[in-house]
């Protein structure tokens, strides 16, 4: 495949680079590109213009081994099956909207139904299925800017939405994702990234023994459609108490009703504090990789890959239940139905601007 590369030397002879490669074509002939970002300090990420997917994310572990810590597929054809949202950008509205309906400014809106009776992750054709325009940013750190225009009425959402998402690898070994959007009408926006993490490596088996801490004292329980009931409950004395670090698998097979219903975790946590703060930290004891999550979003979904689509994944692997965990920073799911939840409303001409950062520490 044809590829293009550029690089920058920094102090201390750190060599950062961005390499562009043709990854494939969609069914209508639109080209999809891969951009490999390398910070020259042991962290690299491969980003696709299809869905803004993080295809690979390599972290150098304590033994010097490059470990790919995200699940994924090898080919565009596999990603086009739209299975599991692996590594993709999610929008306009991440997570669920009950019956695909909400009211805004006295008007009732119906958006795409794609999970039973409900809307999930933007509807039938969300941002995960778009081919994004890409621009390499002239910055001191390898950075890729992706953009799309979501038309007024697309998937039923009001307003023409101009969206920009920027991926940056910092010198301090963090993957930073900045989300920006502006609408010409009042609308709702709730964007995230749906990467599936396994800090031992994408093909290493379950994440049961990996350690997780979540900066949250409250979670939102779900009904049998995985839709929040509207309650906000204390994690104290439940399997949802990750305030102190514990193995992800410690309670994943618990008979606690909310765990049994979904075969693991698929729940929203209210992140303590305001502004840009630490939301979570995960660690693999075997290779010394720790991932810290920082965000200015109010909440985060923990999903423990309780059900993954069948088929062959990267490197010919077949992934199993609990092969990875997702930490999806977000507004609360179905927030428009509950006035006590933080509001995902974006007013006309105002800017939606949030950042989530995945910091990698090895020791």
Residue spans for each PLM region:
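Short, Lys/Arg-enriched N-terminal segments with co-localized hydrophobic residues
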Residues: 1-15
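An exposed, glycine/acidic-rich loop-and-rim segment of catalytic or binding clefts
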Residues: 12, 16-363
């Amino acid at each position: 495949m044809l590829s293009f590369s550029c690089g920058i030397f920094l102090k201390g002879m750190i060599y950062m680079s961005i390499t562009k490669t043709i990854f494939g074509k969609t069914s209508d002939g639109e080209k999809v590109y891969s951009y490999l970002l390398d910070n020259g300090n042991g962290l690299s990420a491969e980003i696709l213009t299809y869905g803004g997917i993080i295809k690979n994310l390599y972290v150098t572990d304590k033994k010097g081994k490059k470990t790919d810590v995200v699940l994924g597929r090898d080919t565009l054809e596999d990603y086009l099956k739209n299975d599991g949202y692996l590594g993709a950008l999610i929008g306009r509205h991440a997570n669920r909207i009950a019956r695909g309906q909400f009211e805004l400014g006295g008007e009732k809106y119906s958006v795409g139904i794609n999970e039973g009776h409900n809307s999930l992750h933007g509807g039938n054709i969300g941002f995960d299925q778009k081919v994004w325009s890409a621009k390499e940013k002239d910055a001191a750190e390898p950075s890729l800017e992706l953009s799309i225009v979501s038309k007024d009425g697309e998937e039923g959402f009001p307003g023409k939405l101009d969206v920009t998402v920027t991926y940056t690898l910092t010198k301090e070994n963090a993957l930073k994702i900045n989300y920006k959007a502006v609408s010409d009408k009042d609308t709702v926006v709730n964007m995230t990234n749906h990467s599936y993490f396994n800090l031992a490596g994408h093909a290493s088996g379950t994440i049961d023994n990996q350690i997780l801490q979540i900066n949250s004292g409250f979670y939102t329980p779900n009904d049998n459609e995985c839709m929040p009931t509207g309650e906000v409950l204390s994690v104290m004395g439940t399997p949802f108490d990750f305030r102190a670090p514990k193995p992800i698998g410690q309670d994943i097979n618990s008979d606690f009703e909310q765990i049994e219903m979904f075969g693991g975790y698929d729940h929203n946590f209210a992140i303590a504090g305001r502004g840009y703060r630490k939301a979570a930290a995960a660690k693999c004891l075997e290779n010394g990789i720790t991932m810290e999550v920082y965000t200015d979003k109010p909440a985060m979904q923990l999903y423990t890959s309780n059900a993954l689509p069948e088929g062959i994944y990267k490197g010919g692997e077949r992934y199993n239940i609990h092969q990875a965990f997702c930490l999806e920073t977000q507004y609360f799911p179905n927030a428009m139905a509950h006035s006590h939840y933080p509001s995902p409303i974006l007013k006309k001409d105002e800017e939606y601007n949030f950042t989530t950062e995945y910091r990698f520490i090895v020791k």
